[in-house]
UniProtKB/Swiss-Prot annotation:
Protein name as annotated: Orotate phosphoribosyltransferase
Role played: Catalyzes the transfer of a ribosyl phosphate group from 5-phosphoribose 1-diphosphate to orotate, leading to the formation of orotidine monophosphate (OMP).
Originating organism: Stenotrophomonas maltophilia (strain K279a)
Enzyme Commission identifier(s): 2.4.2.10
NCBIfam families: pyrE
Molecular function terms from GO: magnesium ion binding; orotate phosphoribosyltransferase activity
Superkingdom to which the source organism belongs: Bacteria
GO cellular component terms attached to this protein's record: cytoplasm
PANTHER family listed in its UniProt record: OROTATE PHOSPHORIBOSYLTRANSFERASE 1-RELATED (PTHR46683:SF1)
Binding site for 5-phospho-alpha-D-ribose 1-diphosphate: 26, 72-73, 98-99, 102, 104, 124-132
Catalysed reactions listed for this entry: orotidine 5'-phosphate + diphosphate = orotate + 5-phospho-alpha-D-ribose 1-diphosphate
Cofactor: Mg(2+)
Amino acid sequence: MSDHRHRFLQLALTADALRFGQFTLKSGRLSPYFFNAGRFDSGSLLSQLGACYADAIDASGIKYDVVFGPAYKGIPLATAMACELAQRGRDLPLSFNRKEAKDHGEGGQLIGADMQGKRVLIVDDVITAGTAIREALGIIRAAGGTPAGIVVALDRQEIASETDRRSAAQSVAEEAGIPVIAVASLADLLDFASGNPELVGYRQPLEAYRAQYGVRSIR
């Protein structure tokens, strides 16, 4: 496992963003783990998380001109990554959207950099059903931008349904024709649990969950 994947999973565990046990997901599935990016709730945690995102996107080779964070969770994540990239000497424009368009002041739905004619990278926490990401793709195209790729924190690598054996991330990647990468995945989580004495007991439930719902890695 690469260093940034291990650092991210350790950070998520420390922040209580990654929890193990039994959790009922929105899909109704009983999952042995749960990820909540909202737990990265301090300047220090977001700074470290931004570095993990930056490492992942640098390793991917995706070319882009603007960083875009979909409302709401994507906004601090994209901001943290953009700040980290600036520290590394790459100061990129940043844009994000409102859930509701304003009809006063500067107006509109978008805040930040102009995306017209630019390659745009979407930064978010996870892709669950893909609804929010598809909305972001539409917003970028309507603003004259070209979606260049998507980076998320965690890829659960599980099928959407019994009739669609792709994950939500795979579906979005195929439909949009752009790469979807993750800082870490379920496969990484299994490796991480195996190497952590406090988590090794969760490996069997994780393996069973992957056997029932897993898909091939997208990275």
